[in-house]
């Protein structure tokens, strides 16, 4: 369930004398949810739920221009209400070797036929138009795609599957459009912990590497205002596909707001010499 969608800039790590020392009026971009952010050539690009295939562009993460349409659903496998641009959810994007790559979830549960898949498109320009190199089928039957590139150049995709509740999986990639090997389950939410205050949900994975260690941020519990328990956790591993229940932190690093619920799907990116944290 999508509620109270806003792009927020709540804090940064070791951020002295920077933009984030200012008093920022949040939300900086109302109406955008489950957002992915890319920095390229001094500008920031964001897309996600309710952007309908559009990107917003900013020089400073605070002041955003008008939406620019970059991609439309154009393939042979989506049908009916699940085929509209309003079903472009949970973006991730990055630049590699002359091409921009865009991923999103098609997450439609309707009366005609539901579609729950990950889609990949690419472009020579950051603002598109992005096209799907393979229009015959989808990449994977999961949601919330997030790409991590290790120091050796190896790509991994993290994603969410509806199995034991919402579970987080990782998969090695041959290239930005193809997988190498089978998906590896990372973890589900643990019963009788802060992760299962209501439903069994683990989603929105994001991985970074710091001082030789791998860190995954993820969200647990349900977004619904009926509960208001959606929180952000961290797991720490010694390899990109080594996350498990045993290496999770035992507490959430960003708690819930019982007064005004906001879905916190994390995205991190470098801002100067610091890591800025944004979420929706």
Model features per residue range: what roles?
Residues 21-279:
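Carbohydrate-active catalytic/glycan-binding domains of CAZyme proteins
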Residues 1-22:
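Bacterial Sec-dependent N-terminal signal peptides
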